[in-house]
Amino acid sequence: MLAVTLDALSAEAFARPAQTLAVEPASELVEATVRRFSMELDAAATAVQWRTSVPRGVGLGGSSAIVIAVLRALCELHRVALDPARMAELALAIETEDLGIAAGLQDRVAQAHGGLVFMEFGDGGAYEQLAPKLLPPLVVAWRADAAQDSGDVHASLRTRLKAEDATTVAGMKELAEIARAARAALIAEDHERLARTADESFDVRRRLLTLDPRHVELVERVRALGAGANYTGSGGAVVAVCRDQAHAATVARALAQLGCGTLAM
């Protein structure tokens, strides 16, 4: 898959030595991150302050952004070096093993590396950093009133994959092929083909999952304006692949009229 981090939507954390674990504002997610870090790396007690501008529950990687930010702050304080792959794995373990949240590596790999990343998963998987300047104009939009728990979406897919459901397995393979086509289009600077891969990816998702009509409405509005569209994650936010900046401005206005928060890239 392809993913890009957004500077305008990010999480920050600050860590300092303390007698006992302290987190401000209180957060089970942050506490679990500090505890896991301390256990894995035998680190002393720490106090952590954190903040985020990432909307939660709309498929923009809000929880994983917080975990990665806290891990970075802890690494800086305790002078620990974690490569991006290890940081992503640790972040995933915190959510899945410690908190019982259904999740995958995707968001965590993208956030641990930063920038534009192409990801291959499974046997022989690899992560490739690409130049963000290859991207065409994009618009990211989300509906705060249509948030949902991403774990619920992931849990359904994970259950079917474990059961080796033929339709689900075939769909995931198709998504992987579409992602490779998107990478090729990006490198060739074929933005029209890139937009089509966004549409193709969404169409596969729609076959595999029962989607919230409020989220689908965003995709359909973008497509009606001639841009490619896909979910950014589990649902609630979309990314529009636009022809140029003027086209992006038109798409952003239309999505704002639906009550969306928008961010143009």
Role assignments for model-derived ranges:
Residues 58-84:
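DPxDG-like acidic metal-binding loop motif
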